[in-house]
Regions:
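Conserved N-terminal subdomain of the carbohydrate kinase-like
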Residues: 1-48, 53, 230-234
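Short, hinge-like loop/turn segments at secondary-structure boundaries
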Residues: 13-16, 90-94, 122-124, 151-155
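Short gly/ser/thr-rich secondary-structure transition/capping motifs
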Residues: 24-33, 83-89, 192-193
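Glycine-rich beta-alpha junction loops
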Residues: 2, 26, 79-81, 110, ...
Length: 234
């Protein structure tokens, strides 16, 4: 498509948290609907508006469901209630993607939207029962909760003076995937080990440290790998 990309306007509060306004009509998000995309080996990462706005959301969901067996899928649910106009359709699409995913990253706010009648941990277990090998729950500066069929654990979030939270979730996911890709080239770290609680926690730790750097500076400015401690990579 030659249509422009979707526009998001972020407004920062005094504590660095962001609120967003999205401009989607007349953009590529409303036009992409073909089946000519190709997903190679490695990882596929999606979520947020990509699973909210049809027709592109339906197309992306199919990419996740029909990806090659060697391709891992990380889904950052990142609900956008303000632009969800068909909640039943959205939930059905999301449930299908969750069932096909390997790792789900979800915030406490996402869980409140999806399961308003449940507390966060019960809701997270509900997601895990839906099919993924691991669920990672973020809640701002609170410890990250990790759930796999083996059990659960927490990853502490180091203190940081927050400047700008734009891109924090994407940076977390990038750190998670980068750790997994790095380790998979040197050891037996693959899809079957995504249920290993210690390994998932180690990958989440890399994600946490990456996102802490990102929120400590202005703009969506994730760190380079050399900015992270070498100890994170094992």
């Amino acid at each position: 498509t030659t249509a422009p990309t979707t526009l998001a306007l972020a407004e920062l509060s005094d504590d660095g948290s962001a609120s967003y306004r999205f401009y989607v009509d007349g953009t590529a998000a409303r036009e992409i609907a073909g089946d000519d995309s190709h997903v190679g080996e490695g990882w596929i990462f999606t979520g947020g508006l990509g699973l909210v706005l049809p027709p592109v959301a339906n197309h992306i969901a199919q990419l996740v469901l029909q990806r090659p067996p060697t391709t891992l899928a990380l889904i950052d649910i990142n609900c956008r209630p303000l632009v969800i106009t068909q909640p039943d359709e959205y939930r059905a699409r999301l449930n299908a993607v969750v069932a096909a995913a390997d790792v789900i990253k979800v915030s406490d706010e996402d869980l409140k939207y999806l399961y308003p009648e449940l507390d966060s941990m019960t809701a997270a277990h509900r997601l895990l029962e839906g099919g993924p090998k691991a669920v990672v729950v973020t809640a701002g500066s609170s410890p990250v909760e990790i759930l796999t069929p083996e059990g659960s654990t927490q990853v502490a979030v180091p203190y940081v003076d927050i400047v700008d939270t734009v891109g924090a979730g994407d940076t977390f996911c990038a750190g998670f995937v980068a750790w997994w890709v790095q380790r998979s080239t040197h050891s037996e770290v693959h899809r079957d080990t995504l249920g290993d609680l210690d390994l998932v926690a180690a990958a989440a730790t890399a994600g946490v440290h990456a996102s802490v750097i990102a929120v400590g500076r202005r703009g969506a400015d994730p760190p380079y790998r050399e900015e992270l401690s070498a100890d994170l990579w094992g």
